[in-house]
Design a protein with these regions (language model features):
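Binding/recognition "hotspot" determinant
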Residues: 1-59
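Hydrophobic transmembrane alpha-helix segments characteristic of membrane transport
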Residues: 59-95, 187-201
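Non-cytosolic segments of integral membrane proteins
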Residues: 94-187, 225-278
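Alpha-helical transmembrane segments and their helix-start/interface "positive-inside/aromatic belt" motifs
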Residues: 1-11, 81-101, 204-215, 270
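Alpha-helical transmembrane segments
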Residues: 192-209, 273-279
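Loop-to-transmembrane-helix entry motif
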Residues: 48-55, 91-95, 172, 182, ...
Length: 281
């Protein structure tokens, strides 16, 4: 409900947008790809994965032949039992990876999701702490006359614009994680087929590392939200109420946006953080 003051209502509207996106992230991060958007997207991805398995089997043979040609100097070497057995085992394991790739990837995601749930439970947070305007700041704004409130309009518009942009960047980053999961799952049979040949196996290793990093991004996002929640529980203080109203509001909004930038930056760089910490780059 509006307070009757345009400046206060504008700031509250921006903070409601921010709080709404935080609540959505908290819900999304605990959602599995099968449950996302009712599971309709996941069903399409499963069908694409199944269709690409046929191509994966064809590439399996191609990568296997290429691997044999490059690793074996001659046909005589291929006749050696240990070499033939090694190539056979590699082909069987690669075929199993293509056939059971969906189960392998969903299992890896469940492990990462279990870590996310553990972090959520350990933090003691059932929901994100809402960011609200302090009553002291509202009183300062409401006591300002019409002429003196003109600078406040510019400060409020600029601050609200920053908050809206940060909210959109933050939620788009979390949604992009789901899209990366879907894309990786859909094309999985292609890179997994590369395990059939030793020279091409680096493609499959890079793919699995990238998928593991995507799954573990959720841990960084949750940790960033938990840390920001601690910041939000102690909002920026009004240091000196004798300053001009525009200065007080600017100082408050500036510190608030800085805290928001820390959260958005951590979420935006979650993939890079995981790759550096876990060596998955």
């Amino acid at each position: 409900m509006g307070s009757g003051n345009w400046i206060v209502d504008n700031l509250n509207s921006a903070l409601e947008m921010w709080n709404g996106r935080l609540a959505e992230i908290w819900q999304l991060i605990s959602t599995t790809p099968e449950e996302f958007k009712g599971g309709g997207v996941w069903n399409v991805i499963v069908n694409i994965n199944g269709a690409l398995q046929a191509i994966g089997y064809a590439l399996l043979v191609l990568f296997f032949v290429m691997g044999v040609v490059k690793t074996c100097g001659s046909f005589t070497e291929m006749k050696k039992p240990e070499v033939a057995f090694k190539c056979f085992i590699r082909f069987v394991l690669a075929q199993a990876a293509v056939s059971w790739g969906m189960e392998l990837m969903t299992g890896a995601f469940r492990v990462a999701q279990g870590m996310v749930t553990t972090i959520m439970d350990s933090s003691g947070l059932t929901a994100m702490s809402a960011t609200t305007l302090p009553d002291e700041l509202v009183s300062v704004i409401e006591d300002v006359g019409f002429i003196d409130s003109i600078p406040l309009w510019a400060v409020t518009l600029l601050g609200s614009l920053f908050i809206w942009v940060l909210s959109l960047v933050m939620i788009l980053t979390v949604y992009s994680r789901f899209f990366k999961l879907y894309i990786a799952t859909a094309i999985a049979p292609i890179p997994l087929a590369s395990f059939a040949g030793q020279p091409s196996s680096s493609i499959g290793v890079a793919f699995l590392k990238s998928y593991a990093a995507i799954c573990l991004e959720g841990c960084v996002i949750v940790l960033a939200c938990v840390i920001f929640s601690a910041f939000a529980s102690s909002p920026p203080a009004i240091a000196d109420d004798t300053l001009a109203a525009a200065t007080i509001v600017w100082n408050y909004v500036g510190e608030l946006i800085f805290n928001m930038l820390v959260l958005v930056g951590a979420i935006k760089m979650s993939d890079r953080i995981i790759r550096e910490l876990m060596g998955l780059g």
